[in-house]
């Protein structure tokens, strides 16, 4: 996860006290990939006055590390276009200082093809696996993979 996402997620984790009922989006996926899984935190991302999604982060009981497997699940609270989700993801990676235009374009193409439009109640889940790949799910169904450790590190 990139610095921006870590900062956003840290704020979400701190907001758990304010959103104790924030449901986990898909704990079954976390259990498939993580031994002795634990929920690290959850919270709601709000942009201006719109609630966008509930995020839940899962890691092994030993704790979250960016270089080890983890699962980040987002339960959407509004309708969004998949292309907009992909575009925002690439913008965040670019804002981290990543400037390789060819790789950004490749990642943008992959994510735009991969991310579906979402509606209130849909969930998207990203898994950072042992090999450093990012595996994406919509609900319980796998929708694709980005097999690029640099992408995974920045995502």
Where are these regions (language model features)?
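Bacterial N-terminal signal peptides
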Residues: 7-17
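Terminal leader/tail segments of proteins
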Residues: 23-155
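Positively charged n-region of N-terminal signal peptides that target proteins for export
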Residues: 1-4
């Amino acid at each position: 996860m990139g610095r921006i996402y870590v900062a956003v997620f840290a704020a979400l984790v701190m907001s758990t006290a304010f959103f104790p009922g924030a449901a986990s989006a898909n704990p079954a996926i976390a259990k498939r990939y993580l031994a002795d899984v634990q929920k690290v935190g959850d919270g709601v991302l709000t942009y201006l006055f719109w609630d966008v999604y509930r995020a839940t982060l899962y890691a092994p009981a030993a704790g979250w590390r960016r270089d080890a497997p983890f699962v980040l699940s987002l339960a959407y609270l509004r309708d969004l276009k998949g292309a907009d989700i992909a575009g925002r993801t690439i913008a965040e990676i670019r804002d981290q200082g990543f400037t390789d235009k060819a790789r950004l374009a490749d990642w943008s193409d992959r994510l735009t093809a991969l991310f579906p439009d979402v509606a209130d109640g849909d969930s998207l889940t990203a898994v950072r696996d042992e090999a450093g790949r990012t595996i994406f799910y919509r609900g319980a169904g796998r929708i694709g993979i980005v097999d690029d450790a640099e992408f995974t590190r920045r995502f």
